[in-house]
């Protein structure tokens, strides 16, 4: 998401918002300010906080966008007027001094799959909206201090997915981080030794830094939906562990699955697959 925000900033910073079309009614989570209130204002910069894209305008209003798991951004030059399947919103910007004139450039937010979870907010000055209460991110002193001192009893996979505990990781990178740290996803922060806590800090920092470096090198559009090739463990069930070669296993939940290496993470033990256990009852 950091690399995406950097590409958007390079593309659109300084451009004027011509219009913001709501294409998926339930995706907009605020009613005031209205999207039209930003029309004619200049986009100053695009940044990121956790899994959210933050667009700051010259009137101190902002748009916050969350693509969720299956969202993507498509550049349209010139902007289109169609409403493709899964369309969430379309933003049209005027470039340079053209301002509100000329065809400009369109940015289509589109969601693939059956679930509709992509969301956006229009926030007034001082309103943090969904950014309130987000946890620290890997690579920061706050993150390292949290890992070193937390006595959380929750499973590591749960804490790493909870954006209000640790932000910017999520389930995909969480699988890769726990394998790199040689930690069971069902262990808790409270149960870790000081050495294991340091291993988790190092793994999180390294995995996220490597992911950002790779994404910055990627060419093409602005899609964030095709991250399968970025992960080394997540989504690779049945394939060999990138470190030891052991077949990666899964634990299935209602709406997602978690991948892990039995040799690297659980001393050879296979964790109970929740979905399979229910079927066998």
Role assignments for model-derived ranges:
Residues 1-116, 278-281:
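Gly/Gly-Pro- and Ser/Thr-rich, intrinsically disordered tail segments characteristic of DNA damage-repair
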Residues 6, 44, 56-59, 69, ...:
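Glutamate identity and glutamate-enriched acidic tracts
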Residues 17-33, 47, 146-281:
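Basic, nucleic-acid-binding surfaces and adjacent catalytic neighborhoods in DNA/RNA-processing proteins
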Residues 38, 131-134, 231, 276:
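Short clusters of hydrophobic/aromatic residues that line enzyme substrate/ligand-binding pockets
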Residues 63-183, 188, 200:
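Phosphate/anion-contacting hairpin/loop surfaces
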